[in-house]
């Protein structure tokens, strides 16, 4: 492995905003789905990736179907606590990133 010179931008930090910004920058680097999957595998445990994937799936189901929380729970096994959390972010939270991602993917929430 080739040696690299130290990056002057990399320094120990406990600042949550700086750490989050650095993570966001890293998450923007994959060029395709395979690269993103590899990055997620490096960053997250399999359980963490599964949790993220479940939240995304629930968001799509809530946005694109008339399924109830109970229906989603029974069909997916995702806890109702998680379903309620995702629903709150879809409806009330200012971020609206779930909806933005679905819009950019041309996704109304329905599975293919």
Describe every region a protein language model picked out.
Residues 59, 84-91:
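Recognition helix of helix-turn-helix/homeodomain-like DNA-binding domains
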Residues 65, 79, 90-93:
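The DNA-recognition helices of helix-turn-helix-type DNA-binding domains
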Residues 52-67:
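Short, amphipathic alpha-helical "recognition" segments used to contact nucleic acids or chromatin
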Residues 88-100:
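Short, solvent-exposed alpha-helical "recognition" segments
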Residues 36-55:
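Short, Lys/Arg-enriched anionic-surface-contact patches
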Residues 100-112:
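Intrinsically disordered, low-complexity basic tails/linkers immediately adjacent to helix-turn-helix/homeobox/MYB/SANT
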Residues 70-76, 83:
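Short alpha-helical "recognition helix" segments of helix-turn-helix
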């Amino acid at each position: 492995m080739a040696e690299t010179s130290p990056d002057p931008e990399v320094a120990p930090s406990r600042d949550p905003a700086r750490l989050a910004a650095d993570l966001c920058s890293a998450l923007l680097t994959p060029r395709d789905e395979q690269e993103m999957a590899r990055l997620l595998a490096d960053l997250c445990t399999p359980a963490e990736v599964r949790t993220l994937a479940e939240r995304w799936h629930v968001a799509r189901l809530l946005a694109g179907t008339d399924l109830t929380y109970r229906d989603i729970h029974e069909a997916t096994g995702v806890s109702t606590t998680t379903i309620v959390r995702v629903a709150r972010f879809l409806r009330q939270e200012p971020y609206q990133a779930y909806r933005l991602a679905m819009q950019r993917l041309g996704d109304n929430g329905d599975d293919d």
